[in-house]
Amino acid sequence: MEKEKLVALLNKDLADEHAATLRYLVHGWLEGEDTPLGASLLSRAREEMWHMHWLGMIIGQLGGEPNLTPAGYPYDPTSRTTIFKSYVEYEEKLIPHYNAEADAVENPHIKRVLQREAWESAIHARKFQRIGGKLSAEQAAGLPGGERELPQDFLDRLQKEVASKNREMLQHVRNAWVFQKDALIAWQLMDQAMGKMKQLAHFAEDVAENGITPTFEPGGIEKITALETALVKAREDVSAARQRHLELREDQESQKHAGLVTNLDLTLQQEDYESAELGDLAKAKS
């Protein structure tokens, strides 16, 4: 298979895995991370992130540009029963899809990755089928989500932080894949991306606890071609985020919620660390 055609194929798969990651994350947050359903869904989402990572690494190795705009995820939102049925159907469709792609490629590593995507999708389908079958009558007929407590304008502010932190994270992930020949720096960027995922989750959980679906705005990922430029831009982004979070921590509404303030304190300390690390990495590359 020609390289350009292979990159296009893998990028489509990447978009599909991205869609699954977001769907299971959002559903897990709406259920609540401390509930059995929520914890199970977040576990599936983490596995989908690995699926994204395997594909993104290959795309980067091939010299391609990763597509970080998620595809759509079709599901029936009528009830938990219909939602989980949709999940089973989605994962089952991926099994023959990935197996067919594996048959079409010659590279042994890429073939194995696609085969693994297929059999892990089969496991996901079985797990979702099992969850759906164990729902109580009340759970089966109901929908996830809590009652709204926070003011709408404050929720809107948190939603913007979800979208902003998501862009920061995806930019780091993209850069780690594209610049993977600089192995140590690429790993440090991926390490920071994992931290940004935790920061994103803090905001998203607060939104979801109010019965609101966390939203992710696609796009905004820069196709930077020089690693030094990527590091400088990353430090600028984290500095801007830190300033917003300092202001958010002092907001009167934030001060009413000790858990939110604690998470912001952690995020601010992490952002100080990230900024210092990025500064040193940029100096080393200059």
Model-predicted segments: where are they?
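Iron-associated oxidoreductase/ferritin-like identity signal
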Residues: 1-286
